[in-house]
Regions:
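N-terminal export leaders
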Residues: 14-20
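N-terminal secretory signal peptides
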Residues: 1-14, 28
Length: 197
């Protein structure tokens, strides 16, 4: 068993994630921070990078925004220290979220830790998509945007449970969804972060 597999086995799904890329509906921009790149050991050399895993998922989704994001990732010669992925208004569904979640699940712990900010705002992912996403997001994520995603109490509950264990989370935007007042109040009780519900 590789070192990464051993580490993943010891962590829950809520503590295994970390990533970041930024793409908008009409345009996209890759936001990176400079950092020192270190070569992985031989056990990790066959694993896909975060960018490679995401390219596969984005091409399978096939929307204009997803394809543009995949093209931009393909042109990136070097992985950055941090990645912000914003796929707003990308016409994504719960099925598309499964592709993104699978890409995250295929990525090593060290690669996932690079995800900083993630947004699927204004995509009709619903409860199913929100629940799928909650099971794959890294606990190191600092910002999450799920505005106007047709999320009800079931999906909201899954995101809320993930957020309780996401020790890196500093801001969550989940307004304009179909959650009950009671669920909104539960989000309001999250501490040490900005919550927009």
């Amino acid at each position: 068993m590789s070192q990464d597999q051993e580490i993943k086995r010891g962590y829950s799904t809520y503590t295994r994630r970390g990533l970041g890329l930024t793409f908008g509906a009409a345009s996209f921009a890759l936001a990176t921070t400079t950092g020192t790149l270190m070569a992985g050991n031989s056990l990790q050399s066959s694993a896909l990078s975060l960018e490679e895993s995401l390219q596969i998922a984005l091409r399978a989704i096939g929307s204009d925004v997803a394809n543009a994001a995949a093209d931009h990732l393909a042109k990136s010669a070097i992985s950055s220290a941090a990645l912000n992925l914003h796929l707003r208004n990308a016409q994504m569904t719960a099925s598309d979220v499964k592709l993104i979640a699978n890409a995250l699940d295929r990525t090593t712990v060290s690669e996932l830790a690079r995800l900083v900010s993630f947004s699927l705002s204004y995509n009709a992912i619903g409860d199913e998509g929100a629940s799928t996403l909650a099971a794959s997001l890294p606990a190191t994520l600092t910002e999450l945007g799920l505005v106007g995603c047709s999320i009800g109490d079931q999906g909201g509950g899954a995101i809320l449970e993930w957020a309780k264990y996401a020790n890196g989370l500093r801001m969550i935007c989940i307004e304009d969804n179909s959650m009950s007042d009671q669920m909104r109040k539960q989000f309001g009780s999250l501490r040490d972060m900005s919550v927009f519900v």
